[in-house]
């Protein structure tokens, strides 16, 4: 959430920066709400001043033994007006809050201008895509002999799900363990196990609500045995997490952290659940875009002056997984028009997918600035001992399913077997090759 003082101070400058990312700020709507708020506050202050003045008169009249009933009646009337004014102010403040919650973050000045992913800027590329001397198979065909089953998953749950058994399930598990071990043992993250179901306050804190509710899986929780209709206001909405970023970042919601406790660095392996509401017809084959997928998430909670240094470090941490797996990748900085809602700057890491003959996103690393912290009221005590908003960062380290796809396709052999990357062999009992079932 943006600082409302930024809008009050120079809304045109904020609107111009937001326009760079394709968002049109409702300047007139904000101005109208601000004018209404000011009018109500002015009227409230006038009523309070009048009530205070009359209260003094009552004291003086009573001190003289004179009748104060008329003045007391006027004070009572003012009290009713103040209650009505407070209610009006609550409504306007609520509308202002709703507007603020719907506004995306302002891009950092270092972010390149652009309208779509076509204008993202490559910052580095590592590894050379392998030249195959046999017809390349995609991960769906390769995985069929290794225990990857989309048909039975469709029977169980519908489209965009997968069942993994045998060798491919072991490889999937090995990848997640390898990622966690690398981040905790080499990159300084603390491993965390977090809930996969969170409340609405947590989703608001990291920015999924209210704007992106259609992308989430909602889990209503009823009070007692009543139906949802009978329960009415007693139904509390919970949500399956779309990423472990949500519970990890919310660890500091409504907290004031000691300055010397920063930075905080967490890593968690979790399933992620997304409805993919806006992705109809995209990546319908295979594991690239699923309703349920595993991911190792990195979150850093830092002091403001260190957040961009932390972003660079986090991006290198994600890249390091691909380096160790010896997978070709490239890193791009997202342009203003391709950035996520809460980000002030984002790097995407894309891995080479041979069957598609292109690079596909496998990680996004973002600096959210104080955008999430303001929503969560997450603060730290600065050197002067005063509470100050934290900066939060998050990044995929990595998406396990997409990494599995990349390993299967880049390490495939002509006979349909898959060579296990050297970095993963300790997690598979030294096994060097995954062979398809006869």
Swiss-Prot record:
Signal peptide: none
Name by which UniProt lists this protein: Serine--tRNA ligase
Domain of life: Bacteria
Name of the encoding gene: serS
Keywords: Aminoacyl-tRNA synthetase, ATP-binding, Cytoplasm, Ligase, Nucleotide-binding, Protein biosynthesis
Pathway it works in: Aminoacyl-tRNA biosynthesis; selenocysteinyl-tRNA(Sec) biosynthesis; L-seryl-tRNA(Sec) from L-serine and tRNA(Sec): step 1/1
Keyword ATP-binding: yes
Domain comment quoted from the record: Consists of two distinct domains, a catalytic core and a N-terminal extension that is involved in tRNA binding.
Entry EC number(s): 6.1.1.11
Quaternary data: Homodimer. The tRNA molecule binds across the dimer.
Positions annotated to bind ATP: 274-276, 361-364
One example of a Gene Ontology biological process annotation: selenocysteine biosynthetic process
Listed GO MF terms: ATP binding; serine-tRNA ligase activity
Chief location bin: cytoplasm
One GO CC annotation: cytoplasm
Species in which this protein is naturally found: Ralstonia nicotianae (strain ATCC BAA-1114 / GMI1000) (Ralstonia solanacearum)
Protein's job: Catalyzes the attachment of serine to tRNA(Ser). Is also able to aminoacylate tRNA(Sec) with serine, to form the misacylated tRNA L-seryl-tRNA(Sec), which will be further converted into selenocysteinyl-tRNA(Sec).
Pfam families listed in its UniProt record: Seryl_tRNA_N, tRNA-synt_2b
Family statement: Belongs to the class-II aminoacyl-tRNA synthetase family. Type-1 seryl-tRNA synthetase subfamily.
Places the protein is found: Cytoplasm
Reaction catalyzed: tRNA(Ser) + L-serine + ATP = L-seryl-tRNA(Ser) + AMP + diphosphate + H(+); tRNA(Sec) + L-serine + ATP = L-seryl-tRNA(Sec) + AMP + diphosphate + H(+)
Binding-site residues, L-serine: 243-245, 297, 396
Enzyme class: ligase
HAMAP family reported in the protein's UniProt record: Ser_tRNA_synth_type1
């Amino acid at each position: 959430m943006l600082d409302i003082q930024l809008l009050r101070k120079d809304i045109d400058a904020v609107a111009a920066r937001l326009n760079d990312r394709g968002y049109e700020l409702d300047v007139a709507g904000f101005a109208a709400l601000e004018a209404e708020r000011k009018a109500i506050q002015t009227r409230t202050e006038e009523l309070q001043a009048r009530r205070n003045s009359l209260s003094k008169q009552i004291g003086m009249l009573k001190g003289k033994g004179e009748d104060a009933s008329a003045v007391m009646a006027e004070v009572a009337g003012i009290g009713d007006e103040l209650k009505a004014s407070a209610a009006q102010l609550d409504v306007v403040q609520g509308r202002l809050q709703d507007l603020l919650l719907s506004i995306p973050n302002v891009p950092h000045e270092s972010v390149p201008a652009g309208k779509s992913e076509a204008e993202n800027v490559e910052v580095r590329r590592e590894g050379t895509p392998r030249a195959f001397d046999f017809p390349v198979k995609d991960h769906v065909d390769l995985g069929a002999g290794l225990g990857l089953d989309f048909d039975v998953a469709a029977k169980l749950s519908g489209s965009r799900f997968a069942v993994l058994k045998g060798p491919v399930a072991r490889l999937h598990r090995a990848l997640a363990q390898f990622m966690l071990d690398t981040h905790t043992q080499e990159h300084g993250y603390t491993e965390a196990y977090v809930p996969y179901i969170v409340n609405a306050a947590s989703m608001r804190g990291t920015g999924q609500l209210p704007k992106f509710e259609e992308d989430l899986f909602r889990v209503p929780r009823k009070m007692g045995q009543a139906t949802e209709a009978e329960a009415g206001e007693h139904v509390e909405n919970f949500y399956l997490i779309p990423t472990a970023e949500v519970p990890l970042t919310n660890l500091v919601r409504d907290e004031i952290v000691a300055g010397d406790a920063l930075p905080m660095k967490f890593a968690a392996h979790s399933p992620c659940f997304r409805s993919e509401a806006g992705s109809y017809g995209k990546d319908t084959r295979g594991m690239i875009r699923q309703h349920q997928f595993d991911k190792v998430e990195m979150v850093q909670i830092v002091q403001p002056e260190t957040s961009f240094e932390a972003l660079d470090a986090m991006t290198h941490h994600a890249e390091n997984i691909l380096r160790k797996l010896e997978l070709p990748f490239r890193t791009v900085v997202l342009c203003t028009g391709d950035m996520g809602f809460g980000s002030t700057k984002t790097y995407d890491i894309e891995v080479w997918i041979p069957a598609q003959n292109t690079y596909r996103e496998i990680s996004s690393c973002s600096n959210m600035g104080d955008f999430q912290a303001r929503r969560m009221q997450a603060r730290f005590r600065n050197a002067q001992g005063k509470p100050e908003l934290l900066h939060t960062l998050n990044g995929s380290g990595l998406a396990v399913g997409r990494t599995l796809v990349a390993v299967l396709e880049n390490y495939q052999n002509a006979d349909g077997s898959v060579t296990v990357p050297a970095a993963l062999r300790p997690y598979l009992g030294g096994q060097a090759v995954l062979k398809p079932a006869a």
